[in-house]
Amino acid sequence: MSIKKLILLALALPIHVHANIFFIKGNTVNDTDVDNAAIYFNAGIGPQTVAWLLSSIDEINGNYRNIQNIDIYLNSGGGDMDSGYMAYEALRKSPTKLNMINASNVASSATIIYCASNQRYAMPMASFLLHPAAAANEINDYLKPDQAQRILDDAEKYNSLFRTIYSSCTKIPAEELKAITSSESRRAIYNIENAKKVGLVNQDIKQPATYPVTYYITDMQN
């Protein structure tokens, strides 16, 4: 797209910016006519990005009383497990139907957010990564036995969380989930066909769509 076309697009559509959230709404669209919206989440999972995601959904629900569906396009390599779980619990209780779409890569703690919806799509070349959680070693020194055990206990807490959520949104056997979350060498990488076989993707390939309201979330630093 040429610079001239980009300038014309900017003039035609109002672009609003809040922190690392950009949203576009057509000039001719009335708030009461909006029944479908999209959020493109292209970021790691952390306290700030999850807050942006949840606040964007709240803003859509608050501004557009006739909203029926929100399509959430995820591209995330994962990040903080606690933030991912908080988002999972908030999203799965959403009064508005949320459709999760793997837009390219959904990995690690981002898979928790993906599993928050019963409507799970993917783009044709998208992939998933399921693997063990990692616990931080805040003591950058030699570890005593009890300190090492605490790190292992923290990791197992998050791996148990992975298994519990995966057992609710996939058909992966319990023994296989145990293996996946026990060793990085047993990590599972799924393309869309294999993700469908295990139930992680339970809808068809997502077709291109246009939306009257679109939000973009990124953790890119300006």
Language model feature labels by segment:
Residues 1-107, 116-222:
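N-terminal organellar transit peptides
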Residues 110:
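Thiamine diphosphate
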